[in-house]
């Protein structure tokens, strides 16, 4: 139990580790290939058994992409994906009938579940304690995807201190009437603003409609402090570029044809689709890290999808690997009020 109760700005958390009898693994020694002649499968990975079900179910009927294909994709990219999501609470967004079907959010890890699934128990100000699953390794990743999760939505703060995030970020979202070219232009405006502050910035496509821009930060500021700074930056950009950018959060008040620089996703408990997440879009697009040069050249959302991102990773590696380097994190302290 927490030493003191949760408040709006303080949320105790506890990690429930896996059974000591099970060994954590990241990726298998050789590429994991799921058989195509089985509908259900008990898959053993270094002593852990993952039950995979309904492998032949079409998740994208028009593309011929099955649940097996989705699981295979995540197995293939797990080596570069897992370092970005370990030790973080995961909000599950489940699509049991595929990308075009109904979905529902699920925060609490379902029971029964394998003994090797680790939990992040977070105390909320309401008094509730929510046991979120943590994806620590390949078996846990496949277990979550098998539940019908198409994309992954992890917290920005690690479970050992859920009030202090590792990132400041912006979600660039086109308001009706705005074009993709407007989104690209906005991304460059945000980049230049962050550059002027000395902040390193890393873009990725959302896989849906926009661009995410992340700044890796030295852990220390609270989520509220990070949100406040992101809000200030967004409003300054909107004031300087009124025909291009809006920072108005209320939908009814947003001017048409602008790009929302959404700072509000920095709020406590919010999530964005993770790096390398497949999105439930008609083309199975993937949220993919890109270079600023690619942004300048006009990269498009549909350039990256479930069937080609693996080859991109083989060629370029993980473009977001610098976000994992503690030495490359930016200290926000001088900008905090």
Which positions does each model-derived feature cover?
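Signature for HUH/AEP ssDNA processing cores
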Residues: 131-206, 216-225
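Short beta-strand
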Residues: 92-95, 201-207, 248-252
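C-terminal accessory nucleic-acid interaction domains of nucleic acid-metabolism proteins
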Residues: 1-65, 69-71, 82, 86-87, ...
């Amino acid at each position: 139990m927490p030493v003191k109760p949760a408040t709006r700005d303080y949320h105790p958390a506890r990690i429930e580790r896996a059974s000591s009898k099970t060994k954590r693994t990241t990726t298998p020694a050789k590429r994991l290939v799921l058989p195509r002649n089985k509908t259900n499968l008990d898959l053993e990975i270094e002593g852990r058994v993952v039950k995979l079900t309904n492998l032949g179910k079409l998740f994208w009927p028009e593309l011929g992409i099955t649940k097996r294909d989705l699981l295979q994709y995540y197995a293939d990219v797990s080596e570069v994906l897992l370092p970005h999501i370990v030790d973080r609470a995961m909000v599950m967004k489940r699509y049991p009938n595929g990308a075009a079907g109904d979905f529902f959010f699920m925060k609490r890890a379902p029971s029964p579940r394998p003994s090797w699934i680790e939990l992040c128990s977070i105390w909320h100000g309401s008094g509730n304690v929510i046991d979120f699953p943590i994806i620590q390794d390949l078996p846990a990743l496949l277990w979550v995807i098998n539940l019908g999760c198409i994309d992954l939505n992890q917290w920005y703060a690690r479970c050992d201190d859920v009030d202090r995030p590792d990132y400041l970020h912006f979600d660039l979202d086109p308001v009706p009437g705005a074009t993709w070219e407007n989104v690209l232009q906005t991304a460059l405006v945000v980049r230049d603003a962050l550059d002027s502050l000395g902040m390193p910035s890393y873009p990725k496509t959302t896989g849906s409609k926009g661009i995410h821009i992340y700044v890796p930060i030295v852990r220390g500021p609270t989520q509220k402090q990070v949100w406040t700074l992101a809000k200030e930056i967004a409003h300054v950009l909107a004031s300087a570029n009124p025909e291009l950018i809006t920072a108005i959060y209320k939908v009814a008040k947003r001017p048409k044809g602008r790009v929302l620089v959404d700072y509000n996703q920095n709020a406590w408990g919010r999530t964005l689709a993770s790096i390398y997440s497949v999105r439930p879009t008609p083309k199975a697009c993937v949220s993919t890290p890109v270079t600023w040069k690619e942004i300048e050249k006009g990269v498009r959302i549909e350039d990256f999808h479930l069937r080609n991102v693996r080859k991109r990773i083989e060629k370029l590696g993980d473009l977001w690997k610098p976000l994992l380097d503690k030495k490359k994190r930016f200290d926000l302290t001088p900008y905090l009020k």
